[in-house]
Curated annotation (Swiss-Prot):
Residues 1-7 form a propeptide. The chain crosses the membrane at residues 8-28. Belongs to the N-Me-Phe pilin family. It is a single-pass membrane protein. Keywords: Disulfide bond, Fimbrium, Membrane, Methylation, Transmembrane, Transmembrane helix. The modification N-methylphenylalanine is found at F8. It holds the Pfam family Pilin. This is Fimbrial protein EcpD. One of its GO terms (biological process) is cell adhesion. PROSITE patterns: PROKAR_NTER_METHYL. GO terms for cellular component: membrane; pilus. Disulfide bonds join C136-C150.
Length: 152
């Protein structure tokens, strides 16, 4: 009597491996995009924490704190404001004449996700009716990595 052979054939195993490869090819780019968006949100969160200090300094002195090299008006030096993926946040006078002050977050060139390494996110402040309006933008990040409020 012949023994019954059980198990998977080579073709079945190859089909399973091909399906796993296709699923991985779809999932990996989606995960990388998600990771970059999460890291961009760290920059936005760090800048959100500085909004009131930047606005208070401007309302009290009519000067935008520039923390390029030193602590300025109670805002830490640029290189001291960082995160896991954010190298620094620079507060300064706005480069766009429609705004008063701005904060520029620069991503690390090593730890950040590849699509955002060394790139920047800008948060600009404008005085409107005695209050502040903030605008988020980036000249070098793809829209897919920016929060909805920053997409233009």
């Amino acid at each position: 009597m012949q023994a019954k052979i059980s198990g998977f054939t080579l073709i079945e195993l190859m089909i399973v491996i091909a399906i796993i490869g296709i699923l991985a090819a779809i999932a990996l780019p989606a995960y990388q995009s998600y990771t970059a968006r999460a890291q961009v949100s760290e920059a936005i969160s760090l800048m959100d924490g500085l909004k009131s200090s930047v606005a208070d300094n401007y309302f009290n002195s009519m000067i935008c704190a520039d923390n390029q090299t030193v602590n300025h008006f109670g805002i830490a030096q640029r290189s001291r404001i960082s995160g896991n993926y954010v190298e620094s946040i620079h507060t300064r006078v706005a480069t766009d004449p429609n705004y008063n002050c701005e904060m520029l977050a620069t991503f690390k060139s090593t730890d950040a996700a590849a699509p955002i390494r060394g790139k920047t996110v800008l948060l600009s402040m404008k005085i409107v009716d005695g209050g502040t309006v903030w605008n988020c933008s980036s000249s070098d990040l793809a829209n897919e990595f920016l929060p909805t409020a920053c997409r233009h």
